[in-house]
């Protein structure tokens, strides 16, 4: 089930993101970058982020399997539990926000993808538009898809 993240979800969502960064993203980013990202997604930071963008979670039997954020026509904060990657959770979350964006009148959706997720976005129909280097958070790849 996909629903909007609520206050009582903050600790579980933060833990999911932190675990995903350590398990899945650490092969593409050095430990300093991963540490910076972990700090950026603490429960208190997530609370602040949720004030400016909608954050959704995919939940099953009380377990948070994934999370995704949407602000205007941009995807943010998209993470799937490492043991659920490749199971369709990511596809379900991304299609959920694509449908929302489409209903809101957006013609395209964009994302600053981690290096780890580029192949997933490509498979979902996203096209590479450029790259950015951030000293604190590492390299990302801008990708977009027409809706």
Predicted regions and their residues:
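A short, internal acetyl-CoA/4′-phosphopantetheine-binding micro-motif in the GNAT/acyltransferase core
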Residues: 78-85
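Conserved beta-hairpin
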Residues: 53-66
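A short beta-loop-alpha structural element at the N-terminal edge
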Residues: 1-15
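Conserved catalytic-core motifs of GNAT/GCN5-like acyltransferases
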Residues: 110-112, 127-142
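Conserved GNAT acetyl-CoA-binding A-motif
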Residues: 101-114
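Conserved acetyl-CoA-binding loop-helix of GNAT-fold acetyltransferases
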Residues: 86-99, 123
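Conserved GNAT-fold acetyl-CoA-binding loop/helix
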Residues: 18-44
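A conserved beta-strand-loop-helix scaffold within acyl/acetyltransferase catalytic domains
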Residues: 68-73
């Amino acid at each position: 089930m996909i629903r909007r993240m609520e206050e009582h979800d903050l600790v579980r969502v933060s833990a999911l993101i932190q675990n995903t960064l350590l398990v899945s993203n650490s092969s593409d980013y050095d430990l300093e970058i991963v540490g910076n990202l972990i700090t950026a997604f603490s429960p208190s930071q997530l609370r602040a982020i949720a004030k400016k963008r909608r954050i959704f979670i995919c939940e099953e039997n009380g377990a948070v399997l994934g999370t995704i954020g949407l602000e205007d026509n941009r995807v943010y904060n998209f993470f799937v539990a490492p043991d659920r990657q490749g199971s369709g959770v990511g596809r379900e979350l991304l299609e959920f926000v694509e449908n929302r964006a489409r209903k809101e009148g957006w013609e395209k959706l964009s994302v600053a993808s981690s290096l780890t997720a580029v192949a997933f976005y490509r498979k979902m129909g996203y096209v590479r538009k450029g790259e950015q280097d951030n000293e604190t958070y590492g390299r990302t790849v801008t990708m977009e898809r027409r809706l």
